[in-house]
Amino acid sequence: MIKQALISVSDKTGVLDFARALSAMGVNILSTGGTAKLLAENGISVTEVADYTGFPEMLDGRVKTLHPKVHGGILARRDFPEHVAALSKHDIPTIDMVVVNLYPFQQTVARAECSLEDAIENIDIGGPAMLRSSAKNHKDVIVICDPSDYSLVLHELNTNNGEATYETKFALAKKVFAHTAQYDGAITNYFTSLGADKQHATRSSYPATLNLHFEKVQEMRYGENPHQSAAFYRESNPQAGALANYAQLQGKELSYNNIADADAAWECVKTFDEAACVIIKHANPCGVAVGITPFEAYSKALQTDPTSAFGGIIAFNREVDGNAAEAVAKQFVEVLIAPSFTEQAKKIFAAKQNVRLLEIPLGDAVNSHDFKRVGGGLLVQSPDAKNVTLAELKVVSKKQPTPQQLQDLMFAWRVAKFVKSNAIVFCANGMTMGVGAGQMSRIDSARIAAIKAQNAGLSLVGTAVASDAFFPFRDGLDVVVEAGATSVIHPGGSMRDQEVIDAADEHGIVMLLTGTRHFRH
């Protein structure tokens, strides 16, 4: 049965109710600084750590709990007679519970105006020491670093004669070690990102050492293939709009490939202002469209490649209503993603329980970095978040684009960014007409896109074409024009740009350069 608890928290969420409940159980509460003041002001009996140790807080609060009477009471093993004798000799009572969360270092350094001095003053010293001491001796000490665990611990204390089960103590200890590791990793990332100048005014996006912290969401039946094991991890606090914030409304457990494809679909559909639908297969868009309603967007997107859409991942950037749900329900779909679903839509999909429905609130989340594992290393880059504006486009052909062509070209360019390289995308009237993806030569991607359109019964006459990178020769351009394209958008930057521009003029088509490449591997 716990007799004494030490509470010292930066995040004071729920701490009053928790401390009040402990006090009602007869637990003596030790505390420091602002936490002690808050408890006392709210009528909760509390002993200041300085009074308990007989040693005052000093150095502007830098030294509060770093004292043998604190750490001895935490670290002593109750089943070791030598430890018990040492406590008795030095008049050190045991501390049976430690409730600590740390100075907000990560939030502090995330501020643009944060100085090195600000960062240093938000490095917690005593807190991690107490947490680690308690977690090390978790057999005898209940340690809490997360306010969300208060209710669990109180429930166990109330049902187990003032004690927590070993299973709970061990789980809380694991959580503490993960928490302190993340905290120290954040400090390391910050310090190793600072420049060598005296004022440390420059800060690199790529620290000398990189510490990553992700929390396991689930283990999966298998990975990309059945012989591979896999798990899904998420950041501690994903940004609004990130896939990791999904809520699954129904359907089987998400697979490795489901999550990878769902992310590709969601990232693409979020880039559109109009109601949009994206259909993904093997991480490539096989149909993308915008419309007045989700139903219209889906109907148009499906036309691009209905064969490949079978068993695909579908994402909307608007609430899915009954009309859209009825249309999608006619198709075999693995995962359906949207900001929300109407009750009618939910009812329709309830009859198809294998369909995984994911709700994700819309947001502008962009990963701070993208990662790619290589043998013995990790490639790290900023995300491809560049969106070209009309003002940045350069018309290099003699023929000027019409407003409709500009609209089609911008749509095609937006889609091409999410197609595996080499990427060629034919578009018209707010929908993809043919998608060529992942070929080693650009000319083959162009041919495949044209074949896809032909197989779907779609005419490419008058279409706009986007290429994720420049045309190295005119042959790729000749193929898309032969298929029916009358306008083309690509980054430019080839040694043979002028040759390709001359070919565009020869064909009498519109050509725009973006100056931005969108390789995707």
UniProtKB/Swiss-Prot annotation:
Catalysed reaction, written as an equation: (6R)-10-formyltetrahydrofolate + 5-amino-1-(5-phospho-beta-D-ribosyl)imidazole-4-carboxamide = 5-formamido-1-(5-phospho-D-ribosyl)imidazole-4-carboxamide + (6S)-5,6,7,8-tetrahydrofolate; IMP + H2O = 5-formamido-1-(5-phospho-D-ribosyl)imidazole-4-carboxamide
GO molecular function: IMP cyclohydrolase activity; phosphoribosylaminoimidazolecarboxamide formyltransferase activity
GO BP: 'de novo' IMP biosynthetic process
Domain notes: The IMP cyclohydrolase activity resides in the N-terminal region.
Protein name: Bifunctional purine biosynthesis protein PurH
Domain MGS-like: 1-145
InterPro entries: AICAR_Tfase_dup_dom_sf, Cytidine_deaminase-like, MGS-like_dom, MGS-like_dom_sf, PurH-like
Keywords: Hydrolase, Multifunctional enzyme, Purine biosynthesis, Transferase
A GO CC annotation given for this chain: cytosol
UniProt xrefs under PANTHER family: BIFUNCTIONAL PURINE BIOSYNTHESIS PROTEIN ATIC, BIFUNCTIONAL PURINE BIOSYNTHESIS PROTEIN PURH
Family named by the database record: Belongs to the PurH family.
Enzyme Commission (EC) number: 2.1.2.3, 3.5.4.10
Domain of life: Bacteria
Pathway involvement of the protein, from the record: Purine metabolism; IMP biosynthesis via de novo pathway; 5-formamido-1-(5-phospho-D-ribosyl)imidazole-4-carboxamide from 5-amino-1-(5-phospho-D-ribosyl)imidazole-4-carboxamide (10-formyl THF route): step 1/1; Purine metabolism; IMP biosynthesis via de novo pathway; IMP from 5-formamido-1-(5-phospho-D-ribosyl)imidazole-4-carboxamide: step 1/1
Keyword Metal-binding applies: no
Xref: CDD domains: IMPCH
SUPFAM superfamilies for the chain: Cytidine deaminase-like (SSF53927), Methylglyoxal synthase-like (SSF52335)
Organism listed in the record: Herminiimonas arsenicoxydans
UniProt KW Hydrolase keyword: yes
